[in-house]
Amino acid sequence: MNRLTDPENLTNAFAQQKRNPFLSSGSLILAGGCIVLLLFLLLQGESGNSRHDQSAVSEQETQTSEKTKRKELIAYLQKYPDDEFAHFQLGELIQDRAPFQALENFSHVTERHPRYFEAVEAISEIALEQGLDGRAKSALLILVREYPEEGHYQKRLARLLFAEGKFNWALRYARRNIESGGRQAEDYLLVAEILRQAGRTIEMTGPLKQALYLEPDLYEAHLNLAYAALYSGDPETATREARWCLSENPESTTALRYLAIINRNQGDIDESISYLNQALSIDPQDLECLLLKADILVFQRKGEQAYELLKPLYATQQTDRRYVSALARAAGLTGRREEALELQQLNQRLIKEEDLRPSSLQSESVQKTQAGRK
């Protein structure tokens, strides 16, 4: 007898057929989405390549155009060498490629040109980049007169004058930079560093504290404050700042030397020598530390140790008056009278040579006189 098919089995069979992944609508949608995404990516790739190619072509066309324009301007200036408009255009085109030639072109631009001060600024930038400090200074002097409110010109000029040793003149422009709106820590630090070289140590504290207010962890400001406090009679501040510097840079021979000086001044010679030995283990050729240690040894009547410490440096330091004077004292203390006399004579010659050099005040006075004659 034939059995009828169970209705539940029929239902289950059809249910299994509907769940077939190859025939589900979700799978079809997913497959279609993948195809669309693939086509999109292919089109994007082609579009990106197209844009890249267009950009490369555009850049090449620009370079070709600039090259053609340079040739035209050069040919034109051979016929009309006094055309300052052409000189300005050529200077702009070649400033990055041929800075010295651009400097020459910009130098032909006079005050009659509507963009004269742009040419002067370009001269200052090129001259600074190429180490032509004299040209840069002349250009910056023009710019600070024309744009006294532009602090960055004042700062650049201050740095140049500082490097030349014209400290009082440099200080004037460094302060004008701050008055013009220069309120960054480095602006105050520059003022402090100029004051230091000018020998105006007590005045350093104000700008250094302002720098540290703006940047509490500025290492150079802490180190300069240690120096200012040391030579202004504030050993507590000097000690605190020197130790802070050592915590940031344990190999700072300068901070170690400051601590050595503080301990020497307080009569703790052993501690002072300990700091100096630590510094010299880091840098055996540190002249400042060597001179300080030799001075302490001479004070202790240990002339032979001081002489042995300094003598090996003679070949490289014989033009340094402080070194020659220290070696002369050590030689005299050890009974080397002839050598001590020769060193004293050398020291006198070095003093005369220094006296013949114009000081920063003298050089500023001369430059003012020359400027007044122009």
Task: Describe each PLM feature range.
Residues 1-15:
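N-terminal intrinsically disordered, acidic low-complexity segments at the extreme N-terminus
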Residues 24-107, 111, 354-360:
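N-terminal leader/linker segments that initiate helical-solenoid repeat arrays
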Residues 62-72, 96-108, 129-142, 164-176, ...:
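Structural signature of tandem alpha-helical TPR/SEL1-like repeats
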Residues 79, 112-113, 146-147, 179-181, ...:
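Structural marker of alpha-solenoid helical repeat scaffolds
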Residues 84-85, 117-118, 151-152, 184-186, ...:
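Helix-start (N-cap) detector for alpha-helical repeat units in TPR-like alpha-solenoids
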Residues 315-355:
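TPR/TPR-like (Sel1-like) alpha-helical repeat modules
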